[in-house]
Design a protein with these regions (language model features):
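Rossmann-fold NAD(P) dinucleotide-binding segment
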Residues: 38-46, 50-84
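Rossmann-fold dehydrogenase core element
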Residues: 93-114
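Active-site-lining helix/loop region of Rossmann-like oxidoreductase modules
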Residues: 132-198
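NAD(P)+-binding Rossmann beta1-loop-alpha1 motif at the extreme N-terminus of oxidoreductases
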Residues: 1-35
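Rossmann-fold NAD(P)-dependent oxidoreductase module
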Residues: 15, 19, 104, 150
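Short beta-strand and adjoining strand-loop segment in the mid-core
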Residues: 85-94, 99, 124-142
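Short acidic active-site motifs
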Residues: 35-39, 121
Length: 198
């Protein structure tokens, strides 16, 4: 059993916290208030960033001490939203939220994952007709191995998990969010994910 703090209690945070609890982990969910986030992060071994991507960097910078030496699982995409509320552009073009978090929190092991799918697929990958792919981006091999284990706890088969390399590769997976509005307008909010077929 691992002590996990999920920062963000929206649809993504709620979905992940319920599934991780069901997998036997000790999960604390924190809302957007700084005090709750700091308390949850301080007592956790692993912290999941499920806060809105546009404000994640500012929120997590305030937790620098609480996050030091810990694994930060970043599942957010930092976007500029259009009038319909769907992503219309990237907040960090040419970079990524994951890269900015790692640069700002050098004592924290940032691992980017689960950001290339509708939130329902994060914890129910077998619900799709085609096998989905989940990606890992991060500098620390040990941290990525731990996160790989969490993904397996969430129902991801080993051969569905692809390690892309360092945190610089998060730029590619975060850019994939620009597909989302077109997919939703075409097919609605039916569950979907990127998939690498070999």
């Amino acid at each position: 059993m691992t002590k996990i703090a999920v920062l963000g209690n929206g649809r993504v945070g709620g979905t992940l916290s319920a599934a991780l609890t069901g997998a036997g982990h000790d999960v604390t969910v924190a809302d957007s208030s700084p005090g709750a986030a700091a308390e949850a992060a301080l007592g956790a071994q692993i912290v999941v960033n499920a806060t809105p991507g546009a404000s994640s960097l500012e929120r997590l910078l305030a937790l620098r001490e609480e996050l030091d030496g810990k694994i930060l699982v970043d599942v957010s995409n930092a976007t500029v939203d259009g009038p319909d509320g769907l992503p219309a552009g990237l907040l960090y073009p040419g970079s990524s939220l994951g890269r900015h978090l790692q640069d700002a929190l050098p004592g924290t092991h940032v691992v980017k994952t689960l950001n290339t799918m509708l939130f329902t697929v994060m914890t129910a990958p077998t619900a799709l007709a085609q096998s989905p792919t989940v990606f890992l981006s991060g500098e620390d091999a040990g941290a990525k191995q731990v996160v790989r284990g969490l993904l397996e706890d969430l129902g991801w088969h080993q051969d569905w998990i692809t390690d892309l390399g360092g945190i610089e590769t998060a730029q590619a997976t975060e850019a994939a969010v620009l597909f989302v509005p077109h997919v939703i307008r075409s097919s609605g909010f039916a569950p979907f994910a990127l998939s690498i077929s070999r």
